[in-house]
Amino acid sequence: MIKIKLTHPDCMPKIGSEDAAGMDLRAFFGTNPAADLRAIAPGKSLMIDTGVAVEIPRGWFGLVVPRSSLGKRHLMIANTAGVIDSDYRGTIKMNLYNYGSEMQTLENFERLCQLVVLPHYSTHNFKIVDELEETIRGEGGFGSSGSK
């Protein structure tokens, strides 16, 4: 179970369907009506609070990714995704970057990104070795597996 703490009731994440992989996170600019809109100029970024803090079970992590509609507006998460560790208790933030040529206006409580919760392999369970086990792919990197 994931516990969710809200800064404001309207920050409640939205789950789009029964089989949705993530929950939509909203922009939270505060409760002052004068602060209901924010703009991001072309080539600039804006750190946005979601008003949501989570308690993710140990062995899992949250991944903040853009909603597909952000691309239509030429907005992206500045570092492409955000990792929320299970021991983090602060509010989740989204750093959005405007890679377009027009000013983009955001509304208070607008759904912008989504939080997907995934299991992870412990980063404390590793061993330094001199050689790795051989595979058919080997060291083939970008494009090595073909495109068709």
Swiss-Prot record:
Q: Which residues form a coiled coil?
A: none
Which reactions appear under catalytic activity for this entry? Answer: dUTP + H2O = dUMP + diphosphate + H(+)
Q: Which organism is it from?
A: Escherichia phage T5 (Enterobacteria phage T5)
Cofactors (names): Mg(2+)
Report keywords, A-Z.
Early protein, Hydrolase, Magnesium, Metal-binding, Nucleotide metabolism
Record GO terms (molecular function):
dUTP diphosphatase activity; magnesium ion binding
Task: Look up the domain of life of the source.
Answer: Viruses
Please state what the protein is called.
Deoxyuridine 5'-triphosphate nucleotidohydrolase
Pfam families on file? dUTPase
User: Could you tell me what induces this protein?
Assistant: Expressed in the early phase of the viral replicative cycle.
Read off the CDD domains from this record: trimeric_dUTPase
Encoding gene (name): DUT
